[in-house]
Amino acid sequence: HMAGSTEILAARALAGNIEDICSVAIFAVAATSSIVIGREIGQGRDSATVYDVGKAMDTLALACGLVLGTFLTVGAWTWLPTAVYPIFSLSPQASSIASMMLSFTGVFLALRSFNSANIVGVLRGGGDVRAAAVIDITPLWLVAIPLAALFGLVLRWGIFWVYVGIVSEQVVKFFLGMWRLRSGAWINDVTRSAPS
């Protein structure tokens, strides 16, 4: 469907694996956030304290994503093309596309990390599963997929613009997630009392 689709697929196969390696740390922070928030609520902490802990976990995730994203973005144009790409015999065009993909991933990794910790960790950990699901799924189906399809399949703008459409999901999730976080409505005590 797109010009250079063979190179795009080869680049995506490699970039996707490198992205998955970076995602391990992001998901670890998100899972930890869920545990910490659930513990704070379960111990009967007041809403202001739980809110502050949620903000702290989101900030930690943002910092983690910023460090990993910087490492990935710099690596995409320095050591990955010389040390990793040759192992997979990527063509020069596929190497360039892989570096572009990894740069997009790196630039938006801090935002993605924040969103994961906020939605999967803080909101779900606070018992706000319904809002977390809506914030997580809606931008994918109403923003990212339609924009990526429009840019790539209808307008045929190329893989750069397809990635612009894909990462737009993270921007929408950020604003929806921040709105929900600031509302404080996500703090729900879902613990059960011990039977007497």
Q: Where are the model-predicted features located?
A:
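Hydrophobic alpha-helical transmembrane segments of integral membrane proteins
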Residues: S34, L142-V143
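Short alpha-helical transmembrane segments in multi-pass integral membrane proteins
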Residues: I37-F108, F151-S196
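Short helix-kink/termination motifs in transmembrane helices of multi-pass secondary transporters
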Residues: A3, V74, T78, I145-P146
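Short runs within selected transmembrane alpha-helices of multi-pass transporters and secretion channels
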Residues: I26-A30, F104-G125, A131-L140, L147, ...
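Small-residue-rich hydrophobic transmembrane alpha-helices
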Residues: L9-W77, S113-A132
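Helix-loop interface residues and adjacent transmembrane-helix termini in multi-pass membrane transporters
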Residues: A3-T6, G125-G127, V154-R156
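Hydrophobic alpha-helical transmembrane segments in multi-pass integral membrane proteins
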Residues: A144-G152
